[in-house]
Swiss-Prot record:
<keyword id="KW-0874">Quinone</keyword>
<feature type="transmembrane region" description="Helical">
    <location>
        <begin position="420"/>
        <end position="440"/>
    </location>
</feature>
<keyword id="KW-0521">NADP</keyword>
<dbReference type="InterPro" id="IPR002128">
    <property type="entry name" value="NADH_UbQ_OxRdtase_chlpt_su5_C"/>
</dbReference>
<keyword id="KW-1003">Cell membrane</keyword>
<dbReference type="InterPro" id="IPR018393">
    <property type="entry name" value="NADHpl_OxRdtase_5_subgr"/>
</dbReference>
<keyword id="KW-0618">Plastoquinone</keyword>
<dbReference type="InterPro" id="IPR001516">
    <property type="entry name" value="Proton_antipo_N"/>
</dbReference>
<feature type="transmembrane region" description="Helical">
    <location>
        <begin position="39"/>
        <end position="59"/>
    </location>
</feature>
<dbReference type="GO" id="GO:0015990">
    <property type="term" value="P:electron transport coupled proton transport"/>
</dbReference>
<feature type="transmembrane region" description="Helical">
    <location>
        <begin position="120"/>
        <end position="140"/>
    </location>
</feature>
<dbReference type="InterPro" id="IPR001750">
    <property type="entry name" value="ND/Mrp_TM"/>
</dbReference>
<dbReference type="Pfam" id="PF00361">
    <property type="entry name" value="Proton_antipo_M"/>
</dbReference>
<feature type="transmembrane region" description="Helical">
    <location>
        <begin position="327"/>
        <end position="347"/>
    </location>
</feature>
<feature type="transmembrane region" description="Helical">
    <location>
        <begin position="643"/>
        <end position="663"/>
    </location>
</feature>
<dbReference type="GO" id="GO:0048038">
    <property type="term" value="F:quinone binding"/>
</dbReference>
<keyword id="KW-1278">Translocase</keyword>
Length: 664
């Protein structure tokens, strides 16, 4: 064991320390702490930077072939129950810690420019720090109980960050929606976790899987019960990774500041669901029915997210549905047995999607100079256009991210997405077709986003269009003088974009099919040997890769004809296919259905319960009080102090008892 492993616990603890110091400062010395803005930012950055350095050290050690290391202490004991808490360092935790810390560090650097004039600047850094700590704690957890603790902490931090601007109604509603939706999945995870412990007597990932299969094979528990436990556990990742049908919270979460969209919705929180599926693979893999549920859930989500993203006009919401779709690819990969492919896409997606979200924040930052600090105007792509000449760094990095997510070689997204599609074709051609069609839609809506934002003429000064958008959003037109041209963002915002562009281009080369170093690292030696037996077939690679690139190029061409060359009118297409257009624009009406069935239904039930509470429960309580009051008022006259009166009462009581028992 390397000495470095003994200090791995510092990786999640250091960001927690930063959050605690700033939090105590904000509570006890609020004004003074807020004045030290830059100092607090540097303090948090230095701590997350140290965690990143330690994470790279652990990753390098694992690459060199060191064995996994687990350190635990007995946290609680009751009879045969012993709960261990500690940390584990293996291939998966080392890889995830590097992803989380690198993206978190770059997001924190970016935040200094994006949130420079926000009065909650210091509080935001505290939230970022505790969120990073929670995610890292989840990554290093050695058992399911500890995962669940940090899982809930991640959810709490998400609530705080999405609702950071709590004085805005939309943000307050969005964080509540995210919190409640995730509670549904978390309750399923809790039930599944308890069910697995009841069956196997363990919270250890490997032990749970082995014991569960032994119990099923010996007939001690039914296979149906094992399926139920596995699906219940999967409900947690369904909510956290915004999978159908618990996906509705993710687009609303864009109400939070853009750096959070990059951190939560690209590299960390939404990836936590895929990470948990990977951790629980010993439980899921031997249960074909559970794997089918996982695969079809992922495929449905990928297709659903892509179809909704086709018509989005808000740049951040378009990226949100894109994230939902890409997470669907990862989950589908896990369900068809593509453990390595799913993790590979998680890694590549984390970097290029973080860059895309930060790029959208840079665009919004520039647009606010022209249209003001109104999200309706600053985030609407219909008011953008021609930004490439004003914001060349942002445009170039956004184009790199767009090419990566579209799966154009040699960018990172091509290698990971192509591997998933290849495995899907072997497992189930229907799943492959869904993934293939989704790839075409991805290319279309991402280049639609790029062309609307960065190409053509700048539309931000069109007052009539501004008034039209504000009226549609139910807001009154604003008056005020703004600039006439957007500007490039400061270095603190463009540097993270340029840094993320490097892995967005190059990191996919770790997983090329003729020398898959990523697969060799993530797999155990036996699994790597099995994978090597299949070898690399050039013809198969060219056919599968050609298909995925071909559909992407078709999507790009259609987007170019519609939004760059204006040869196809999108409005006429919308009129020609109104049902499909409205279905996409209204997000398949999921929000409306959930609102009418669950929200309004719950409110109606609550009103009925209120009536019962008011008339029955309160009535019984009030009646008891009134009866007590009246009896007290009546009995107080008995206490008059005269002995002969007390004797008369006793005589009457005795006489009454005699008569009663005589009759009886």
């Amino acid at each position: 064991m390397e000495p470095l492993y003994q200090y791995a616990w510092l990786i999640p603890v250091l960001p927690l320390l930063g959050a605690m110091v700033i939090g105590i400062g904000l509570i006890s010395l609020n004004k003074f702490t807020n004045k030290l803005r830059q100092l607090n930012a540097v303090f948090v950055l230095s701590l997350i930077g140290t965690s990143m350095a330690l994470s790279f050290g652990l990753l390098w050690s694992q690459i060199q072939g060191h064995e996994a290391f687990t350190y635990t202490l007995e946290w609680a004991a009751a009879g045969d129950f012993h709960l261990q808490m500690g940390y584990t360092v293996d291939h998966l935790s080392a890889l995830m810690s590097v992803i989380v810390t690198t993206v978190a560090l770059l997001v924190m650097i970016y935040t200094d420019g994006y949130m420079a004039h926000d009065p909650g600047y210091v509080r935001f850094y505290a939230y970022l720090s505790i969120f990073s700590s929670s995610m890292l704690g989840l990554v290093f957890s050695p058992n399911l109980v500890q995962v669940y603790i940090f899982w809930e902490l991640v959810g709490m931090c998400s609530y705080l960050l999405i609702g950071f601007w709590y004085d805005r109604k939309a943000a307050a509603d969005a964080c509540q929606k995210a919190f409640v939706t995730n509670r549904v999945g978390d309750f399923g995870l809790l039930l599944g976790m308890l069910g697995l412990y009841w069956a196997t007597g363990s919270f250890e990932f490997d032990l749970m899987g082995d014991r569960l299969m032994d119990l099923v094979s010996t007939g001690q528990i039914s296979s149906l019960l094992a399926i139920v436990f596995a699906v219940l556990v999967f409900l947690g990742p369904v909510a956290k990774s915004a999978q159908f049908p618990l996906h509705v919270w993710l687009p609303d979460a864009m109400e939070g500041p853009t750096p959070i969209s990059a951190l939560i919705h690209a590299a960390t929180m939404v990836a936590a669901g895929v990470f948990l599926v990977a951790r629980m693979y010993p439980v899921f893999e031997p249960i074909p029915e559970a794997m089918n549920v996982i695969a079809w859930t992922g495929a449905t989500t990928a297709f659903l997210g892509a179809t909704i993203a086709l018509t989005q006009n808000d740049i951040k919401k378009g990226l949100a549905y894109s994230t939902m779709s890409q997470l669907g690819y990862m989950v589908m990969a896990m369900g068809i047995g593509g453990y390595t492919a799913g993790l590979f896409h998680l890694m590549t997606h984390a970097y290029f999607k973080a860059m895309l979200f930060l790029g959208s924040g840079s665009v919004i930052h520039g647009m606010e100079e022209v249209v003001g600090h109104n999200a309706v105007l600053a985030q609407d792509m219909r008011l953008m256009g021609g930004l490439r000449k004003y914001m060349p760094i942002t445009a170039t990095t956004f184009l790199i991210g767009t090419l990566a997510i579209c799966g154009i070689p040699p960018f990172a997204g091509f290698w990971s997405k192509d591997e998933i599609l290849g495995l899907a074709f072997e497992a189930n051609p229907v799943l492959w077709f869904i993934g293939w069609a989704t790839a075409g839609m991805t290319a279309f809506y991402m280049f639609r986003m790029y062309f609307l934002t960065f190409e053509g003429e700048f539309r931000g000064t069109d007052q009539q269009l501004q008034e039209k958008l504000l009226t549609a959003a139910g807001q009154a037109p604003e008056e005020g003088h703004h600039g006439s041209k957007p500007h490039e963002s400061p270095l603190t915002m463009t540097f993270p974009l340029m840094a993320l562009a490097v892995p967005s281009v190059l990191i996919g080369l770790l997983g090329v099919p003729w020398g898959n170093r990523f697969e060799a690292f993530v797999f155990s030696p036996n699994e790597a040997a099995e994978a090597a037996e299949h070898g690399f077939e050039l013809t198969e690679f060219l056919i599968m890769g050609g298909n995925s690139v071909g559909i992407a190029l078709i999507g790009i061409t259609i987007a170019s004809l519609m939004y760059l060359q204006q040869r196809i009118d999108p409005a006429r297409l919308a009129e020609k296919f109104p049902v499909l257009y409205q279905l996409s624009l209204n997000k398949w009406y999921f929000d409306d259905i959930y609102n009418n069935v669950f929200v309004m239904g719950t409110r109606r039930l609550a009103r009925q319960i209120l009536e019962v509470d008011y008339r029955v429960v309160d009535g019984a309580v009030n009646l008891t009080g009134i009866a007590t009051l009246l009896s007290g008022e009546g009995l107080k006259y008995i206490e008059n102090g005269r002995v002969q009166f007390y004797a008369l009462i006793v005589f009457g009581a005795v006489l009454g008892f005699v008569i009663f028992f005589s009759v009886a």
